[in-house]
């Protein structure tokens, strides 16, 4: 039997609950994946992540290629043996980090030559090399090598980039040798509907175990972003998981889940925590603010995370203002649990056929009377209007 299967178990409009089977366990979707950039989620142990309901962890091919190196990880048992997380892993292809972090020297048909941000050495990353690195790392879900154009980009560049990404997908697929890893293709096209449609339809032709919506959440307006998400989920196969890359703001998750997205990742909840802010239903609490210094309340009433069950806002504000690392750790723990609770509540609402009510209640608390048009339009397009 194929170690990878995806089955849709419930629907409400275009929102759906699914179950994704991998060699390291089955997970329920929609879900949010914490990002462990260098093989760890900053400040949090695997047992902490398991306790708050994390199901899949993401790590970055680019960073692990630079250090400790893929062959060392392979020799030490792959990610599952090396990093202590026994559940499913997802590795990205390295393409986005090359564009955003590495000092890119050249991009051509062969691949990308970039200068390491660590030591300045020149490194060449091709589709074949990206797949080889991901096979050495041993994640359950791996990504085809792609080019993520910046926003805004000229249409000519977007078109050339998406065609190159499709050719790189074909090379990634040919380079793949491990049957115990599922390769996802990534659709690009920026915010151009015609190019996004073409990229999505051409990517589907490869009949892959899953598909990612790439090239969004890179600075474009929310209206444009969700128009592309709506278009993409309308075109992508119903029986495959859909992954919206780099998206982690709660309101974005609620809108995208309503359109049928299954997987999300982002550094936002942990980075926000390290910078001293907590996610709550009304938005964010900046714990650097003096008004929290005598506030005994938990960050979020009803939250079952260790942070909320143990500490008040006053203590957390003290830690943040004192620069204590524990402050960032406790806020990161809460912020991830906040997103996991959000996706858990979404799954329950979908199973009960009331996703529209769930999303409207979310919007009432998050936005008050000023619900942005893009959010309302996304809900209506998902059948929750």
From Swiss-Prot:
Active site: residue positions: 92, 265
Annotated region described as RNA binding, given as residue ranges: 246-252, 270-274
GO CC term, one of those recorded: cytosol
Disulfide bonds: none
BP term (GO), one: queuosine biosynthetic process
Reaction(s) catalysed by this chain's protein: 7-aminomethyl-7-carbaguanine + guanosine(34) in tRNA = 7-aminomethyl-7-carbaguanosine(34) in tRNA + guanine
Keywords: Glycosyltransferase, Metal-binding, Queuosine biosynthesis, Transferase, tRNA processing, Zinc
Enzyme Commission code: 2.4.2.29
Pathway(s): tRNA modification; tRNA-queuosine biosynthesis
Residues binding substrate: 92-96, 146, 188, 215
Binding-site residues for Zn(2+), renumbered to this chain: 303, 305, 308, 334
Cofactor comment: Binds 1 zinc ion per subunit.
GO molecular function: metal ion binding; tRNA-guanosine(34) queuine transglycosylase activity
Entry cofactors: Zn(2+)
One Pfam family, short name: TGT
Task performed by this protein: Catalyzes the base-exchange of a guanine (G) residue with the queuine precursor 7-aminomethyl-7-deazaguanine (PreQ1) at position 34 (anticodon wobble position) in tRNAs with GU(N) anticodons (tRNA-Asp, -Asn, -His and -Tyr). Catalysis occurs through a double-displacement mechanism. The nucleophile active site attacks the C1' of nucleotide 34 to detach the guanine base from the RNA, forming a covalent enzyme-RNA intermediate. The proton acceptor active site deprotonates the incoming PreQ1, allowing a nucleophilic attack on the C1' of the ribose to form the product.
Complexes and interactors: Homodimer. Within each dimer, one monomer is responsible for RNA recognition and catalysis, while the other monomer binds to the replacement base PreQ1.
Similarity comment text for this entry: Belongs to the queuine tRNA-ribosyltransferase family.
PANTHER family: QUEUINE TRNA-RIBOSYLTRANSFERASE CATALYTIC SUBUNIT 1 (PTHR43530:SF1)
Annotated protein name in UniProt: Queuine tRNA-ribosyltransferase
């Amino acid at each position: 039997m194929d170690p990878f299967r995806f089955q849709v178990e419930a629907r409400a409009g275009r929102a759906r609950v699914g179950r994704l089977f991998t060699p390291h366990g089955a997970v329920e979707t929609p879900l949010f994946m914490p990002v462990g950039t260098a093989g760890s989620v900053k400040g949090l142990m695997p047992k902490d992540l398991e306790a708050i309901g994390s199901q899949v962890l993401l790590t970055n091919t680019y960073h692990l290629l630079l250090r400790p190196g893929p062959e060392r990880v392979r020799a030490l048992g792959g990610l599952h043996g090396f990093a202590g997380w026994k559940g499913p892993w997802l590795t990205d292809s390295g393409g986005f980090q090359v564009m955003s972090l590495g000092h890119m020297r050249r991009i051509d048909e062969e691949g990308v030559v970039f200068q390491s941000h660590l030591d300045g050495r020149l490194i060449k990353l091709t589709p074949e090399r990206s797949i080889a690195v991901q096979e050495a790392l041993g994640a359950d879900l791996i990504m085809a090598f792609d080019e993520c154009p910046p926003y805004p980009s000229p249409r000519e560049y977007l078109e050339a980039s998406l065609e190159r990404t499709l050719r790189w997908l074909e090379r990634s697929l040919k380079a793949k040798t491990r049957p115990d890893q599922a390769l996802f293709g990534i659709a690009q096209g920026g915010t151009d509907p015609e190019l996004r449609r073409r990229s999505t339809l051409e990517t589907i032709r490869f009949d892959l175990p899953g598909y990612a919506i790439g090239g969004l959440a890179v600075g474009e307006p929310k209206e444009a972003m969700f128009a592309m998400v709506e278009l993409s989920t309308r075109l992508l196969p119903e029986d495959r998981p859909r992954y919206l890359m780099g998206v982690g703001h709660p309101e974005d998750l609620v809108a995208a889940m309503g359109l049928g997205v299954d997987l999300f990742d982002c550094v936002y909840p942990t980075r926000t925590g390290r910078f001293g802010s907590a996610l709550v239903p009304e938005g964010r609490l900046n714990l650097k603010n003096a008004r929290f210094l005598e506030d005994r309340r938990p960050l979020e009433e009803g939250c079952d995370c260790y942070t909320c069950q143990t500490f008040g806002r006053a203590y957390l504000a003290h830690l943040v203002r004192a620069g204590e690392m524990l402050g960032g750790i406790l806020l990161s723990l809460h912020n991830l649990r906040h997103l996991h609770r959000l996706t858990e509540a979404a799954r329950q609402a979908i199973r009960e056929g009331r996703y529209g009510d769930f999303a409207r209640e979310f919007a009432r608390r998050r936005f008050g009377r000023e619900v942005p048009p893009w959010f309302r339009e996304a809900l209506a397009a998902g059948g929750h209007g």
